[in-house]
Amino acid sequence: RRVLFRSRVAAERDWLDLQQRHGVPVHIFRLAGIYGPGRNALRDAREGTARRIRKPGQVFSRIHVDDITETLVASMTHPDAGRIYNVCDNEAAPSEDVVAHACQLLGLAPPPVVPFEEAAKAMSEMAKSFYADNKRVRNDRIKRELGVALRFPTYRAGLDALFAAGE
């Protein structure tokens, strides 16, 4: 986990160095968990692969792919070289809540809640690292500086739209 964090920080530093050395304007985007068509809790629930893992107090921020696009376009119309932006929706939530909402939309019984300690026994180290920290991120800067108005401000709004689109 620390190695991944360090590599991300190093990558950001490299991009900012490129800007300094060559005058190439750079924006850095730190993306929350990405979902959208073909990659979402509805699909997982329908395929029977969704899991409701409970780790008390654990939440994750997410972002719909369409809102990522909106943010990137906004950054081009409001350039501020060297800025770092967190790109996420307005509501971090436990993954078990996201799965439960997807199942509700589909009319399926949600899978049983599995305590993290139990689920971790069968997880890869990478999967376990995902649960190591809360992933609550604030998006104030994209709204304030770039004027982004999220189409999907919550995972519920995003899943509802995906469901309505036949996902």
Model-derived regions: residue spans:
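Mid/C-terminal beta-alpha module of Rossmann-like enzyme folds, strongest
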Residues: 69-127
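Conserved C-terminal active-site "lid" loop/helix of NAD(P)H-dependent oxidoreductases
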Residues: 96, 100, 120-149
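Amphipathic terminal alpha-helices
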Residues: 153-167
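NAD(P)-dependent short-chain dehydrogenase/reductase
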Residues: 16-60, 65
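Conserved active-site helix of classical SDR/Rossmann-fold NAD(P)-dependent CH-OH oxidoreductases
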Residues: 9-17, 69-70
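Short, small-residue-biased leader/transition segments that mark boundaries at the very start
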Residues: 3-4
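Residue-level signal for the nucleotide or nucleotide-sugar donor/cofactor binding architecture
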Residues: 63, 93, 137, 153
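Glycine/proline-rich active-site loop of Rossmann-fold NAD(P)-dependent oxidoreductases
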Residues: 9, 22-24, 34-47, 74-85, ...
